Amino acid sequence: MKRNAIARIIIWSLVAVLLASLLVVGISSSPSSFFTGDWSSGIIGVTYKNSARYNVGGGTVTDEFHSIKVNWTNGKINIEAYDGEDTVISETEVAEKENKLRWRVEDGVLKIQQMAAGMRFGLKQTPKKTLTVKIPSNVAEGLKAVTSDSVSAEVTITGISASDKIEIDTVSGGANLKNIKTEKLDIDTVSGSIKAAGEFTELESDSVSGDVTISTATPLKKLDCDSTSGNISLTIPKDSGFTLKADTVSGDISCGLPTVSESKNRRVCGNGSADFETDTVSGDLIITSAE
């Protein structure tokens, strides 16, 4: 009897340690880093600061803001400029209150979370939802920064200007940016293509299993672009000056701009002032000039 009691104590102690470990992982995780699919089992933790101060569900933003920060897990993210007067947030309709989006303006930043903060136990479905943020054109032209962090979501940004940066980070989903203006554009995706067109002077991108297609109307000052199992296509102004250092495995380099110096993995165009670095595996690098 005594041995059985000791055995039960040991077993339940191990169970308690395991549950405590899962709880710590859940608490320390954000929705963008902890979900791995449509269904999750065990303990799911969704945390962000001041969660009780967030608005529940979509709505109209009345407070002024200069930046946008989105944390989204599954579905689609659409951020776009429009001719209206108010910034409007909406999402695919969901029944459960805990699965409705949360948003608030804090220190000039419009923050959007996919769902309520808290712990979830057992088998849970992470809802695939489409987030739409419509911003008046006069506001969209004067933003400071736009950042989006997601796990399995397609990201589309249209007609947005951000003086500092636009930053997209997604694991399983592509990014499509149209008519954007920013100083720095930073896009990372593991399984998805990247498309970006507009005006920007600094570009960083990293793509695994997807093509990268970039078009900018302004000369780039810095480029750092990596692609695995995909091509990099870059369209830049014809008077661009840059020094290209390219590392490619099982791929070709094609440069449609006049070069003043050329070697196997290096090209110098114009005054060579901008720094271009690319790394491709099983993909081509194609540089063309805009008309």
Predicted segments, located by residue:
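Acidic/His-rich segments in extracytoplasmic proteins that coordinate ligands and/or metal ions
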Residues: 107, 114, 127
